[in-house]
Amino acid sequence: MGAFGGPDIVDDGLLIAIDAGSGRSYSGSGTSVSNIIDDSTYTLQNSLSKVSDKGGTWDYDGADDYISGPTNSFGTLSAYTIAFWARRDSENKMYISSNPAYFYWYGDNSWRYVHGGVGGEYYYSKNVSIPLGTWGYYVATYDGANVKIYRQGIYQGAKATTGTANFDSLIWQFGKHGGSGSYMFNGLGGNIYLYNKALTAAEVTQNYNAQKNRFI
């Protein structure tokens, strides 16, 4: 798949690809956003709008802006990858989540991913996290044994966990906590990807290099 403003990203196994800068994903007006992979419709909620920064991104106000997805039926996955670009402008805010609890959030002194609501949590300290106001490429992969975290295309560490991820009948939401509706994201949101496989370290780097000239 040709990435907006750059070379190809890995497209094998893609379930979700959303990009405000692509006409295939957003026309530039209205509230309907298309998943480029299956043409399913996501909806801009409240005052969330596209801005021209970085070729087209979403401007979340931190109050009530978010994107709501349809009910997806991706099944039970033994491996997957979640990846996104974002520029956070304040702490303690969510960017991507689903209900139940597969989610990221930015804390005052940590960055967190939860796999399946229990276990699979991974923290790293603020002195190696991406500062406020800076674009970051965040990736979590699950291969059936470990959740691995990548930042700016670089491996950060892993958390051992087992089992499968039930992505059947889930509603993905971008910009808020899917369960409670809190932790509203404040900042700019870029491309969002979900794969039905665990990307390798080389594939994570490939995707980062394909789009870094747009976002960094």
For each predicted feature, which ranges?
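Extracellular glycan-interaction patches encoded by glycine-rich segments
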Residues: 1, 118-119, 168-190
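Extracytoplasmic low-complexity segments
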Residues: 1-64, 204-216
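Extracellular/periplasmic catalytic domains that process cell-envelope and extracellular macromolecules
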Residues: 8-11, 50-52, 75-77, 105, ...
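Extracellular/lumenal ectodomain signal focusing on beta-strand-rich modules
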Residues: 17-20, 137, 191
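Extracellular glycan-recognition modules
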Residues: 27-29, 45, 61-119, 130-132, ...
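Short proline/glycine- and polar residue-rich coil/turn motifs
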Residues: 128-132, 164-165
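Short, solvent-exposed beta-strand-to-loop segments that form ligand-recognition rims
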Residues: 151-171
